[in-house]
Swiss-Prot record:
Catalytic reaction equation(s): tRNA(Asn) + L-asparagine + ATP = L-asparaginyl-tRNA(Asn) + AMP + diphosphate + H(+)
Record Gene3D superfamilies: Bira Bifunctional Protein, Domain 2, Nucleic acid-binding proteins
Protein name (Swiss-Prot/TrEMBL): Asparagine--tRNA ligase
Gene Ontology molecular function: asparagine-tRNA ligase activity; ATP binding; catalytic activity, acting on a protein; nucleic acid binding; transferase activity
Length: 432
């Protein structure tokens, strides 16, 4: 019996007869030969039908195929060194499952809005396919890395009673007779998990009501947030470096085909796998920008152009450490050597992509954290449970958060973050 295989496994079946279920992405004919561009969700490759090698019925069926028709094929796999994939199939038989007219996305240039309106279909095309395969590798690498490091997956709630960072960029939800908000971060609940289980990571959707149309912003995005008990900031930076190096290495090892589809130069990513990220102080980053003629002073936060400039000075991610307390959230621990700054760090991705990680050592002292909550103008009652984490068995602890789509955008070298998620939610878009 002929074996049913995926396109991705073609290399294991060279010169063998196999069966596949596929969709048609494009077709061209030169009289007695029909060339079919095929996909099956694992890869794209070419099928060839020669009139002299198949029945009249099969050849006519192939001629009738329309874009995104679905069908079974039987044929023999051969090497094809001209293609990105490296293999093709000589088709001897096919069985049509569905074959309808009117597929809206033709093999021509389409506008961004048109493709977003048809995102449910555009996902089938080569570019989003490659991005989502890389996204999947990054997800698997994340789980593998943290399990090996002794972390457990910990699930934080989506509904929040209050804002984790005291911001106003919140989506309000009516929660029966109470007010609730969609989560901007699972961090505070992650800290509770760390005090129970030592080392945890949360991974899920977060929401931010930012009225921004910038290429690095969405209203719904995914965050990966580890929290680690008994750990100081320097140790946290070591973990961040190892994690990012491991994740990029997994993409390079498992997604060579997808990187080729995207035209992404893997050599631009390779330095990251070596680690050795520079740890640049906020003070030195300000000096670097000032020397470049930028209008910025100590105490200012970095804008996207500032982060972009800094990132272009390095061939791999860089840590910017110890920001002023005035521009970071209340829960961070102050630097014992300089109480005007926090023990915190952002990871800036190279090639102008800016911040992808943010983290800090958390303030572990009950009285100091209570004071910082009050100084931030937050309702102390809302954070009493959070203070309890320090009151009962509080220890030094640290954590960080990774913007998943921002990291994907850098690794895939995307122009806009909306490409990094299957169905982007933007200020002007909630469908499909």
């Amino acid at each position: 019996m002929t074996e049913l295989i995926s396109i991705k496994d073609s290399s294991k079946h060279v010169d063998q007869e196999v069966k596949m279920h596929v969709w048609l992405t494009d077709k061209r004919s030169s009289g007695k030969i029909i060339f079919l561009q095929l996909r099956d969700g694992t890869a794209f490759f070419q099928g060839v039908i020669r009139k002299n090698d198949v029945s009249e019925e099969v050849f006519e069926a192939a001629k009738s195929l329309r874009q995104e028709a679905s069908f079974y094929i039987t044929g023999t796999v051969h090497e094809d060194k001209r293609s990105h994939f490296g293999y093709e199939i000589q088709i001897s038989d096919l069985e049509i499952v569905s074959n309808n007219e009117g597929y809206p996305i033709g093999n021509k240039e389409h506008g961004v809005d048109f493709l977003l309106d048809n995102r449910h279909l555009w996902l089938r095309s080569k570019r989003p396919f490659a991005i989502m395969q890389i996204r999947n590798t990054m997800f698997k690498a994340t789980v593998d890395f943290f399990e090996k490091e002794g972390f457990i997956k910990f699930d934080a709630p989506i509904f929040m009673h209050s804002a984790p960072e005291g911001t106003t960029q919140l989506f309000h939800v009516e929660y029966f007779n109470n007010d609730a908000y969609l989560s901007q971060s699972g961090q505070l609940y992650g800290e509770a998990g760390a005090m129970a289980y030592g080392k945890i990571f949360t991974f899920g959707p977060t929401f931010r009501a930012e009225e921004s149309k910038g290429r690095r912003h969405m209203t719904e995005f995914w965050m990966m947030e580890p929290e680690m008990a008994w750990m100081h900031q320097d140790e946290s930076l070591d973990i961040q470096e190892r994690y990012l190096a491991y994740m990029v290495k997994q993409v390079l090892e498992n997604n060579e085909y997808e990187l080729k589809i995207l035209g992404r130069d893997p050599e631009k990513l390779r330095p990251t796998t070596e680690g050795n990220f520079t740890r640049l102080s906020y003070d030195d980053a300000i000096k670097m920008l000032q020397e470049a003629g930028r209008d910025i002073k100590w105490g200012d936060d970095f804008g996207a152009p500032d982060e972009g400039y800094i990132s272009e000075q390095f061939d791999r991610p860089v840590f910017i450490v110890n920001y002023p307390t005035t521009i970071k959230p209340f829960y961070m621990k102050k630097n014992p050597d300089n109480p005007k700054e926090y023990l915190c760090a952002d990871v800036i991705a190279p090639e102008g992509y800016g911040e992808i990680f943010g983290g800090s050592e958390r303030e572990g002292n009950y009285e100091i954290l209570k004071q910082q909550i009050e100084e931030a103008g937050l309702n102390l009652e809302d954070y009493q449970w959070y203070l309890d984490l320090r009151k009962f068995g509080g220890v030094p602890h640290s954590g960080f958060g990774m913007g998943f789509e921002r990291t994907i955008a850098w690794i895939c070298k995307l122009d806009h973050i909306r490409e990094a998620i299957p169905f982007p939610r933007l200020i002007n878009r909630m469908q499909p």
